[in-house]
């Protein structure tokens, strides 16, 4: 039962944080496309690790990540207003490059397949 509730809390916090980033943050440094990939709220609901995937060049990624980290207090307050929990979790923003890593592996596999096709001819 507790696992089920934790999963629901994670998904609800993820949905609200995505909405806050998309609609409510007005920071001009957030220029790249940002998506929240995962949220892990601790069992005591004191902390929430928010994994974000940022698309763009390296400079805009760094600026966007810094802007999100500096906006974590605002995000926390908004989550507290929107979701009724015993504690409003402290938001910890972390970069998630798993999507880019997956795309890189796909490109390597495509190159290997091309080389095999070329060698077989």
Swiss-Prot record:
User: What is the designated name of this protein?
Assistant: Ribosome-binding factor A
Q: How does it assemble?
A: Monomer. Binds 30S ribosomal subunits, but not 50S ribosomal subunits or 70S ribosomes.
**Record organism:** Clostridium tetani (strain Massachusetts / E88)
Q: Which UniProt keywords apply?
A: Cytoplasm, Ribosome biogenesis
- Which family does the similarity line name? Belongs to the RbfA family.
Entries under InterPro entries matching the protein: KH_dom-like_a/b, RbfA, RbfA_dom_sf, Ribosome-bd_factorA_CS
| Source organism superkingdom | Bacteria
Q: Which SUPFAM superfamilies match?
A: Ribosome-binding factor A, RbfA
**Biological processes annotated in GO:** maturation of SSU-rRNA
Disulfide-bonded cysteine pairs: these are none
- Where is the protein situated, by its record's location annotation? Cytoplasm
Function, in words: One of several proteins that assist in the late maturation steps of the functional core of the 30S ribosomal subunit. Associates with free 30S ribosomal subunits (but not with 30S subunits that are part of 70S ribosomes or polysomes). Required for efficient processing of 16S rRNA. May interact with the 5'-terminal helix region of 16S rRNA.
Report the principal subcellular site. Answer: cytoplasm
Q: Name one GO cellular component term.
A: cytosol
Identify the gene encoding this protein: rbfA
Q: What are the protein's GO molecular function terms?
A: ribosomal small subunit binding
Which Pfam family, an example, fits this chain? RBFA
């Amino acid at each position: 039962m507790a696992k089920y509730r934790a999963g629901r809390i994670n998904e609800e916090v993820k949905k609200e944080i995505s909405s806050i980033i998309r609609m409510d943050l007005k920071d001009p440094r957030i220029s790249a496309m940002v998506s929240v990939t995962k949220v892990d709220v601790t069992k005591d609901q004191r902390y929430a690790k928010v994994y974000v995937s940022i698309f763009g060049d390296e400079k805009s990624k760094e600026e966007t990540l810094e802007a999100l980290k500096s906006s974590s207090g605002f995000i926390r307050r908004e989550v507290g207003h929107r979701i009724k929990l015993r504690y409003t979790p402290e938001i910890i923003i972390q970069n998630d490059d798993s999507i880019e890593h997956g795309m890189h592996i796909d490109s390597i596999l495509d190159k290997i397949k091309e080389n095999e096709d070329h060698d077989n001819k």
